[in-house]
Amino acid sequence: LDAISEHYLRQTAGELDTYPRGVTPREEVWRAGNVSLLRFESPEGVEGQPILIVPSLINRWYVLDITEEVSFIREFAQKRPVYLIDWGYPGAEVGHLPLSHYYHRSIRRAVRFMCREHGCDKVDMLGYCIGGTMAYAFSCLEPDMVDHLVLLTAPIDFRDSGIFGTYADHFPTEEFKQSMDFMPGWLLAFSFNFVQPMGTWQKTKMFKDKFESKGFMKLYNAMERWIADPVSYPGKAYYHMLTELYKENLLSQGKLTTAEGLLVDPAARRSKALILNAGKDHIAPLCTTQLPQSDKAPVKQVTIPSGHIGITTGRNSRDASKSALEFIMN
């Protein structure tokens, strides 16, 4: 499926296909179906407790490594060993897997591998968007495996989740469950355009104003390449995300359970957490990033004046990555 996706991308992306998916050198250290674990290159002598990055299931991971100048991963790898879970290009073959397969089994396997490699019993973790939701759920299920937890624009409390909550409330989830093995990536990408209908116009205007800047064009083209690389969402996992998280808000209420019946209990979390949210976020509004009242573990919050994507690639992204790294290192 990865090869098919690559062929499709070459046909549709044109010149953008020549842009790399992530700029920091890396190697794949294990793979299970679509899911793989990547280890990024660090300067000689860099050691310490490894960091696991859990990206969103809804788009490609390399928004966190978009150019040499704008990269969470590159900055982290200067200080610590860095790993990332690459969800690949899921299709019908994984449509039967529940959401907990990703937020528990897959993350646990990655953490165990890292602990064996580095002789440690826990790791530091950063989760972005729904990847942050999954990282948080994992920290509640396996509290002894996570030391520092950075929740980067991660929705946890879905009571007032804005336009995406409205979308989930009106989405025909039961009909989807009966008829679809996955939510097509192209349809998800198309839907996002309607969330901010003026976004394309604003982007075009920005291009007109700044196209003579080489730095701007490098980032602009890299971002367009990322946008042209959509990811499908596994069917059962998508159903669980809409019903258990958005519609029923089970995670925040301490009622979410895995497919095996394990309770995702916020009161069980013991890791030190940083809520790193974005003041202009329309995907994960500030209120959705707050932790449940039953979660009494240490937590601090830093709000960056940017949007959901801008916090990783915009002018304030360096402030965000610096805040995350300082939290982990301290």
Enumerate the predicted regions with their spans.
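Short, surface-exposed "cap/lid" segments of acyl-processing enzymes
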Residues: 15, 22-91
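Short beta-strand immediately N-terminal to the catalytic nucleophile in serine-hydrolase-like folds
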Residues: 125-127, 152, 276
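Short beta-strand/loop motif that positions the catalytic acidic residue
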Residues: 269, 275-277, 281
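Gly/Ala-rich beta-loop-alpha elbow adjacent to hydrolase catalytic centers
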Residues: 126-131, 135
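Catalytic histidine-centered segment of alpha/beta-hydrolase-like enzymes
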Residues: 283, 301, 306-321
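Conserved alpha/beta-hydrolase "acid-adjacent" motif
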Residues: 282-288
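Alpha/beta-hydrolase-fold enzymes
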Residues: 116, 120, 135-236
